[in-house]
Design a protein with these regions (language model features):
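Cys-nucleophile CN-hydrolase/nitrilase-fold catalytic domain and related Cys-dependent amidase chemistry
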Residues: 14, 22-104, 113, 174-196
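CN hydrolase (nitrilase-like) catalytic-core segments centered on the catalytic cysteine
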Residues: 56-76, 142, 151-237
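Short, acidic/polar
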Residues: 16-25, 152-158
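A conserved C-terminal secondary-structure "cap"
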Residues: 246-269
Length: 269
């Protein structure tokens, strides 16, 4: 399975962001799946989310559907602000090669942090949380999907793995405070926990932005090896995933099958 991570520069011009995302996906060539970063068409700023938001089947989503159909690929459209009534969600839409929307993930764990001497951000001041674990089916098997801060919650990723997820995709805009300490180790740890590939796709770093993303989009294999990491600048990274590794690692080190459900149990509500 060949994937492309689109680590793109995000500007204040929504229409230009959409055009740029389409151009970068086209530049990836012959791929099976592309993934865009968190808030790919909107500055990562509470002051922007509602103004840049759109309802289901809005203009950014229509463009992504058309792009998936044009390229004949699966497309994880990073995330964007989704409007529903008075609520705003941080939402990732997934499109099949025929342009059909086959999955929607609304960020479950909102990014509310206040690090002494570092980053402060309160998504909950504007955004509402999602309530559903998200997986989707492809010819290569089941894929899991979460957004940024969701990736810190092992329980959520375990539920995806128990559904059969072979890859966990996370569009993610980590920042200059948390990412140097946690970005690489977090994606490696989720790969260890769930014995699957983990794919983190960031916006490119823009030092002039109000919120500065880390960049360094990453892919880890089921043995927790980093097999791809981008620089901080804009990049299109194409990686071939050997999904037979998932079965091999789970067979050799049977963590999922060795769980003691007579002692403890993780349930999905």
């Amino acid at each position: 399975m060949k994937i492309a991570q689109i680590q793109m520069h995000v500007s204040a011009d929504k229409a230009e962001n959409i055009r740029h995302a389409c151009d970068l996906v086209r530049s990836a060539g012959d791929i099976d799946l592309a993934v865009l970063p968190e808030m790919f068409c909107c500055p990562y700023d509470n002051a922007c989310f509602r103004d840049y938001g759109e309802p289901f089947a809005g203009p950014a989503q229509r463009a992504m559907s058309q792009l998936a159909r044009e390229r004949g690929i699966y497309l994880i459209a990073g995330s964007l602000p989704e409007l529903e009534g008075h609520r705003v969600y941080n939402t990732s839409f997934v499109y099949a090669p025929d342009g059909t929307c086959i999955a929607r993930h609304r960020k479950i764990h909102l990014f509310d942090i206040d690090v002494e001497g570092g980053q402060r951000f309160m998504e909950s001041e504007v955004l509402s949380p999602g309530r559903e674990v998200t997986t989707f089916d492809t010819p290569w098997g089941t894929m899991g999907l979460c957004i940024c801060f969701d990736m810190r919650f092992q329980e959520l990723c375990r539920l995806m793995a128990l559904r059969g997820a072979r890859v966990i995709f996370a569009p993610a805009a980590f920042n200059m405070t948390t990412a140097p300490a946690h970005w690489k180790i977090l994606f490696r740890q989720r790969a260890v926990d769930q014995q699957c590939f983990t794919v983190g796709t960031s916006p490119a770093r823009d030092k002039t932005a109000s919120y500065v993303a880390w960049g360094h989009s990453i892919v880890c294999d089921p043995w927790s090896r980093v097999i791809r990491q981008c620089p901080s600048r804009e990049a299109v990274a194409v990686t071939e995933l050997d999904l037979s590794m998932v079965d091999s690692v789970r067979r050799q080190l049977p963590i999922l099958s060795a769980r003691r459900e007579d002692v403890y149990r993780l349930t999905e509500l």
